Amino acid sequence: MDVILLERVEKLGQMGQVVKVKPGFARNFLLPQKKALRATKENLAYFETQKARLEARNLELRKEAEQVAGSMGNVSVVITRQSGETGQLYGSVSSRDIADALAEKQIQVERRQVAIDQPIKTLGLFPVRIVLHPEVFVTITVNVARSADEAELQAQRGGMVTGLREEDEEEEVEETATEEGGEETAA
């Protein structure tokens, strides 16, 4: 089925292009979301008359998305979940969980704007794309941990913390403090 794209669609094409897609994709996604029109003579003529208005609307939406992207900066969200000793979660973190965590930080995004290929099933730090507009996206860091304390440790170390007891953590902190002190005197 041939359709006329009314906005940029990732991995498909730019606004105004006539592209061939599978009928189910057109009927179930592109047409209901008003991202495309069927490529008929009447719709081609309609698109040409409305092209300037559509481009202006697209530009306005893009500017709004860029402002939101600028305000998001380096956002990081913490999601606490129960897990086994190896770091495997007893469930998963989905796009809905990430959208809810962003909503707690007063950032409103829909779950369909959170672009993760597969649900997150382990503890750790994960980069996640938030698609604010077909041409504007922001990458945030999702910190999945067992507790808030563990989330802080993961953020400091830049990775998953597994099986550390409090005594081990204190010893590591003391060791790094002495190493840093030794480097300063040598310099």
Curated annotation (Swiss-Prot):
The entry's keywords: Ribonucleoprotein, Ribosomal protein, RNA-binding, rRNA-binding
InterPro entries named among the record's database cross-references: Ribosomal_bL9 (IPR000244), Ribosomal_bL9/RNase_H1_N (IPR009027), Ribosomal_bL9_bac/chp (IPR020594), Ribosomal_bL9_C (IPR020069), Ribosomal_bL9_C_sf (IPR036791), Ribosomal_bL9_N (IPR020070), Ribosomal_bL9_N_sf (IPR036935)
Pfam families hit by this protein: Ribosomal_L9_C, Ribosomal_L9_N
GO cellular component term of the entry, any: ribonucleoprotein complex
Family membership noted in the UniProt record: Belongs to the bacterial ribosomal protein bL9 family.
Function summary: Binds to the 23S rRNA.
The protein, known as: Large ribosomal subunit protein bL9
Source organism per UniProt: Rhodospirillum centenum (strain ATCC 51521 / SW)
